[in-house]
Amino acid sequence: MKKSNKLLDNKKLSFYNSVNNHILVLFGLISITCVFSDFYYKTSNLTIPFIITTLVSSIITFIGIPKLKKIKIKQIIRDEGPKNHFLKQGTPTMGGIFFIPIGIIVSNILYFNQENYNIILTLSFVIIFFMFIGFIDDFLSLKKKLNTGLSSNQKILLQSLISLIFILICASNNLIPQNIQIANKVFNIGNLIYPLGIFVLLAESNSTNLTDGLDGLLSGCSVLIFTGLAISILIENPSNNSTLAPLCIAMAGACMGFLFLNKYPAKLFMGDSGSLAIGASLGGIALISNHLWSLLIMGGILAAESISVIIQVSIFKISKRVKGKGHKLFLMTPLHHHFELKGNNESLIVSSFWLITLFLVIINLIFLIKS
């Protein structure tokens, strides 16, 4: 019995070490990318914001965990979720309030009163307010002692309102180009870009919200996507977008610092305050930099998570109406839960989704370089 327990402990230790190794590899990969970018592009300034935000984010998050435990800010696990998730019950949540502001503050300090600083301010507005919507949702969830805080309609209404204000600010300052670049073609859609912009912010923030279901999944994917966006911006227009690229990498660093404590087994969850803000920042940056196509490619995992839910609900409703009994295509959605119920290890799923995201980022960058 002692021998079997020792063997089990050794397996757990080996597994824990492999998770740490993956995160160190990710940190090293992004750091090298930043250094190379700063060397290659004269206007690039990625290394310093990335290192600063990673360090500060990890320190602030580490300090914040005991504070959350003290005031009993703990995750509520939904009853219909995978059974192994009940082991996560009581893990502190609302981590977004610690790491999201770090990326914003560092960006504002580095580029205060510089050219295009109004872009940083405008994006800071939408990110902070989406974080605040998430905070309200997290708070109400804890108050009700349920996994749901705001209703779907309430959340969509608040997101739509903030998105509309953001779009109006962008329109009055000509921050969003009225054309969309897809592959090598440019489509001028005029004022249609504004309703599209609202849709992008809603779709992206809800996709990131759905993706945040496994330890380190969203934070790790976000590090890669933010970095990919930064490099994409520099490739397309290194001289005019030197403000947006460091903002991307500052957000990547903030997510990276959080990931050190969000890795399996997570010591802290980001909550809706983190996931909604990440989605808003990705969507907002992609809109202003005209990289919606790049975001769609690099955020393939985010899109897949969201689409899996839409397909599942649609098939269930249609089959129930036609046959009188609802049928499911997936064991459970979002998509990561389907793979969980298939018997796959949580960290294996997370690492695989990171790898797919890395592959999609590389594909996008190759495409941009060749075009």
Swiss-Prot record:
Source organism, top-level taxon: Bacteria
E.C. number(s) listed in UniProt: 2.7.8.13
Biological-process GO terms, alphabetical: cell division; cell wall organization; peptidoglycan biosynthetic process; regulation of cell shape
UniProt-listed InterPro entries: Glycosyl_transferase_4 (IPR000715), PNAcMuramoyl-5peptid_Trfase (IPR003524), PNAcMuramoyl-5peptid_Trfase_CS (IPR018480)
Keywords associated with the record: Cell cycle, Cell division, Cell inner membrane, Cell membrane, Cell shape, Cell wall biogenesis/degradation, Magnesium, Membrane, Metal-binding, Peptidoglycan synthesis, Transferase, Transmembrane, Transmembrane helix
Transmembrane segments: 21-41, 46-66, 92-112, 119-139, 156-176, 182-202, 216-236, 241-261, 268-288, 296-316, 349-369
Descriptive protein name: Phospho-N-acetylmuramoyl-pentapeptide-transferase
Organism of this sequence: Prochlorococcus marinus (strain NATL2A)
Lineage of the organism: Bacteria, Bacillati, Cyanobacteriota, Cyanophyceae, Synechococcales
